[in-house]
Structures are given as C-alpha cells and as structure tokens.
Amino acid sequence: MGASQSAEQEARPEVVRIDRNEIPEEYKTVGVSSDVVSRVNATRVAGNDGESDRLRQELAREREEKARLREDMAKLSQLQQRKTAGISAAPVSISGNDLEERKKIFDDTVERVQKQFFAYHRENVCQDNENEIVRCLQENPGRVLKCAPLTEAFEKCVGEFRQQVLKGN
C-alpha cells in the first residue's frame, strides 16, 4: 500500500449548481437555514482573504495616483486657461510666482512620468551565455553547429528570465 492510500484524504464538499429553469414550479421555494448561509459565506471569505487584501491595497494605490494626476491636470488646465486669457487680451508678463508654479508642476509631472515608465531597466541576466555564443561564433566561422550546445543554456536562461518578468519579480 502506498502512502497516499493509507493517509486520510481531506473531505471536500461537492458543489451543486441548479438552474432555475430546471426546477419544477412546486419546488421553487426552498428554505435554507442560517447555518448553511453562514458556511457558504465563511468559505467564500476564507478563500479570498489574502488576495482581496492585496487587491484592495493595489486599488487604493491606483486611486491615489489617479487623484494626483487629476490634481495635476486641473492645475495645468487652469494655467492653460490663464495663458489663453492672457494671450487673447493684452500680452501680460508672467509673474515670478506663476512661473515658479508652472515650473514646479512641470517638473513634478516629468519626474512622476519618468519614475512610472522609464525608471526601471532590467539588466541582461543572460549576458554571459550571449558572450559565450558570440565568442564561439567568432572562433568557428562557417561552423555554426559547433556552437549549438551553447544555445540551449542561453534559451533556458531567457525562458527563466521571461517567467520572472511575467510573474513580476
């Protein structure tokens, strides 16, 4: 007898789904005890506890970022309106405070965009494998098949790196 046959297996309740159109009219009213309702709610809450917390935190971060972007957009719109109002009237010199405010908003926006889209660059983790292949090809011109075993290690490295990127590590 194997270990899996002698060990107790976890009893999982079977899930039953019933469509309303499959139920005869006389059985459409079904009473469910509060115990059943609490068990269903408890399994639903227990199964998603960590995931729901993570999603709530992510949603809160995104909402904060969205609020900051809206504030910046509103400030930029106000500045744009002031600018167009100034152009349509008479050419008015920009005050020092207005200029500083515009510069600060612009710099903050540029910094946020750079941080969000351009800040993180992954290093070439497969550089060693790549260098070996290039060196082999240079040492063996016209004999590409001699370098074929090196490509397996390179492809494995690239595949692992791709999985890490997709997982978000």
Curated annotation (Swiss-Prot):
One of its GO terms (cellular component) is MICOS complex. The keyword Heme does not apply. It comes from the Eukaryota. A motif (Cx9C motif 1) lies at residues 126-136. Disruption phenotype: Abnormal mitochondrial morphology with localized swellings and tubular extensions. Double knockout with moma-1 or immt-1 results in reduced or no brood, poor growth and withered gonads. Furthermore, in double knockouts with moma-1, the gonads contain fewer mitochondria. It is a lipid-anchor. Keywords: Disulfide bond, Lipoprotein, Membrane, Mitochondrion, Mitochondrion inner membrane, Myristate. One of its GO terms (biological process) is inner mitochondrial membrane organization. A lipid is attached at G2 (N-myristoyl glycine). A motif (Cx9C motif 2) lies at residues 147-157. Residues 123-165 form the CHCH domain. InterPro entries: MICOS_subunit_Mic19. Plays a role in maintaining mitochondrial morphology. May act as a component of the MICOS complex, a large protein complex of the mitochondria. Component of the mitochondrial contact site and cristae organizing system (MICOS) complex. This is MICOS complex subunit MIC19. The lineage of its organism: Eukaryota, Metazoa, Ecdysozoa, Nematoda, Chromadorea. The gene is chch-3.
